[in-house]
């Protein structure tokens, strides 16, 4: 089973009235003010999966600052996932500072949400260190068995729109504070795997994964072997970051990486299947 653990879809209204959404959210404006920045629907994702030979995809929300935009987006994610016959796995978006967040989480979980993401604490205006928002997110992970996906930012290298998301020090602190919560550090965790060499970090990272989303835009292909050496293939998830990167392109790039058969199977889908408690086949 091949599972893309990191894709994004939006309701059709977002593309149809993009200017209105650009005015309502600073981070959306940063990422999508360029008309060439693609906004994809569920139908486009499913067509891409068919073309690439991908069985299932995690369909992520966007880190809106406005809780009402989160709700609007999540309704679409959950409705389209339900219609997909299990091919789309919904990760809802959340503004944890909103007073109705706990009620929203209960409702979304009942409708089939499997995780929260891609969360962007910096642009959404909260910290993961000693904060009510961190406590709420850990509670959501425990209470509803939700996987938390964070947009983790590498602290060095070139700048690009939307880079700010979550500094690696905050991600590391959240993991050590709440080691029982399942976490995905997107984009190779912003360098998090290196810190698995610290014994107390390694001890806390048993339920922590990193994904390969947008690898070709950030790292050389050697990142796969280096991260496997640091945390093991069992903690790496294949992710494309569709539609920013095409799924066929991302999968072909992964298959160009020399991996043993077991590591390839884990990264291409077995890790995600186990993490998300999906049935075989």
Please describe what each predicted stretch is:
Residues 55-56, 64-156, 218:
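Active-site gating/metal-coordination segments in enzymes
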Residues 114-115, 127-237:
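Catalytic pocket-lining loop regions of alpha/beta-barrel enzymes
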């Amino acid at each position: 089973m091949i599972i893309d653990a990191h894709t994004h879809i939006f309701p059709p209204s977002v593309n149809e009235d993009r200017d209105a959404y650009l005015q309502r959210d600073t981070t959306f404006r940063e990422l999508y003010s360029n008309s060439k920045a693609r906004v994809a629907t569920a139908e486009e994702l499913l067509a891409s999966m068919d073309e690439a030979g991908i069985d299932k995809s995690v369909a992520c929300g966007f880190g809106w600052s406005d809780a009402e935009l989160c709700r609007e987006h999540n309704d679409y994610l959950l409705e389209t996932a339900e219609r997909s016959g299990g091919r789309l796995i919904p990760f809802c978006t959340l503004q944890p500072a909103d007073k109705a967040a706990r009620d929203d989480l209960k409702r979304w979980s009942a409708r089939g949400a499997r995780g929260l993401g891609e969360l962007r604490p910096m642009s959404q205006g909260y910290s993961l260190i000693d904060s009510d928002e961190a406590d709420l997110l850990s509670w959501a992970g425990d209470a509803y068995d939700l996987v938390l996906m964070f947009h983790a930012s590498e602290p060095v290298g070139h700048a690009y729109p939307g880079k700010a998301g979550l500094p690696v020090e905050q991600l590391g602190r959240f993991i050590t504070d709440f080691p029982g919560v399942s976490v995905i550090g997107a984009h190779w965790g912003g360098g998090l795997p290196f810190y698995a060499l610290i014994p107390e970090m390694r001890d806390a990272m048993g339920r922590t994964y990193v994904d390969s989303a947008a690898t070709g835009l950030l790292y050389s292909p050697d990142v796969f072997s280096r991260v496997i050496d640091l945390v093991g293939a069992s903690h790496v998830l294949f992710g494309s970051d569709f539609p920013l990167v095409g799924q066929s392109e991302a999968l072909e790039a992964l298959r160009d990486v020399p991996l043993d058969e077991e590591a390839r199977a884990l990264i291409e889908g077995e890790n995600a299947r186990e993490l998300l408690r999906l049935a075989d086949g």
